Regions:
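Short glycine-rich His-centered loop
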Residues: 5-27
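Secreted/periplasmic proteins that engage bacterial cell-wall peptidoglycan
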Residues: 30
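Short glycine-rich hinge loops at helix-strand junctions in the catalytic core
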Residues: 46
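Nucleotide donor/acceptor-binding cores
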Residues: 3-5, 74
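Glycine-rich beta-alpha loop elements in corrinoid/cobalamin-binding modules
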Residues: 34, 38-42, 50-172
Length: 172
């Protein structure tokens, strides 16, 4: 049975990409601080949220897909931050791999990315990565909450949300 939540915040796993074989035993696992902050911000105004920490749970893409299907979110948000300044860019490859996998599996929820890399290069990120529908500028707190107010994710509805870049078919 699906839960029908508003948004799932995903902390992507790129440990094998960063640490290669060392990740089997020695890779660090960061607390999903940014996912927790964003989730609580949305929860505090009445939205039903979930956090999926694919890094801590060491979930495969297939396992992640199954969990997302059970949650049945309106929106999927990849939180590509870290406590290290460079970790946003470092974690992008794992996040993009998973978002592409989900799009190829016909998960229909819009995919949002928030993080230091997409803040620095919002339009370039959308141009290069076709699996991403929306990127948030700044920390994403207010823009995500404003996106959650929208029932139908069309150009007309998204164009008035401040602090985002988004894809409308092939236009950014």
């Amino acid at each position: 049975m699906s839960e029908n939540i508003d948004i799932v915040f995903i902390t992507p796993n790129n440990s094998s990409g960063i640490y290669q074989e060392l990740s089997n035993e020695y890779s660090a696992i960061e607390t999903p601080t940014w996912s927790l902050l964003l989730a609580e911000s949305c929860r505090s105004v009445g939205h039903k949220v979930s956090i999926l920490d694919t890094l801590a749970e060491n979930l495969s893409d297939d396992q992640t897909e199954n969990r997302i299907k059970k949650l049945n979110p309106r929106i999927i948000c990849f939180v590509v931050y870290g406590q290290n300044v460079n970790s946003g860019t470092t974690n992008m490859s794992g996040a993009i791999r998973l978002s592409s996998y989900l799009k190829n599996k016909n998960i229909n929820a819009p995919i949002i990315f928030v993080g230091s890399h997409v803040q620095a290069l919002p339009s370039q990120t959308l141009e290069k990565e076709k699996s991403i529908d929306i990127v948030c500028l700044n920390e994403g707190v207010y823009s995500i909450r404003n996106i959650l107010k929208i029932k139908d994710f069309t150009f007309e509805n998204l164009k008035n949300v401040k602090g985002i870049y988004f894809r409308d078919k092939d236009k950014i």
